[in-house]
Amino acid sequence: MSVGILRARSRTAARRLHPGLRQPLAVVGVVIVAAWIVLAVFAPLIAPADPLEQTFPASVGPSWDHLFGTDELGRDVLSRVLYGARVTLPLSLLVVVLAATVGALVGAVAGYFRGPLDGLCMRSTDLVFAFPPIILAMVVAAVLGRSLQNAAIAIVIVAWPPYARIVRGLVMSVGDTEYVQSARLLGASARRALVRDVLPNVAGPVLVLMTLDLATAILLLSGLSFLGLGAQPPQAEWGSMVAVGTQYFQWWWMGTFPGLAIFTVVVAFNFLGDSLRDVFDPQTSYRAPEE
């Protein structure tokens, strides 16, 4: 397989990207994610009150004064949901980027050099895969201590192996092509071959997995906070807000609105991930109707 063929495939994927993202579910995902990003960025201007302020009547239902009601301490729920987005979204993105970076590096090294190093890397992924992700994340977070930062570290430890597996397989496939073998014979260093010739060809599948993993990271981060292993009071975070809401079922709005925030963001990233997978997977790629 020549360099020209691989570049042609990359151009083909780029051409498919636009019509692929015009699918209805992709549009819905983009709109929801964009809306939440805007709300998170401008939360200080949009929020009607300070998320930690306790000067309002406690446990008041939704009204014109408090669209999402107030919680058990008299804090405005809408303000806390908006500020919770400023915590959950950037931290989830950071977690996914770190996990993808670690996993891609491990997978690239294992797939390119192979041999004993490949075996060591893959056994490390097997060790992580042996445990359910939420259980392993709970154990790591509990050992490190209860904080949002430690919860993020725990999720990175859980999330990197899939990237290593995917990148390893793709690197081994691309590494056997004629142009990579020719680069080796011409004396190209391993670093140059990986960075210039191999990794660009695995970017598509990694991007798809990162988009889908954003939804998983949000769920895990919220789940750990729900269990008391992530965000600690009085910080505004969606998972911890849902946890408090479960203690007051008669005041349904306290847990419902942060739960809806989690639901909408997770569904939106899943829509985006599925659409990107259609773009980069030739077997399920989107095809525009013929005129």
What are these regions (language model features)?
Residues 24, 72-291:
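Alpha-helical transmembrane segments of integral membrane proteins
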Residues 22-25, 56, 64, 221:
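A structure-centric signal for secondary-structure junctions around beta-strands
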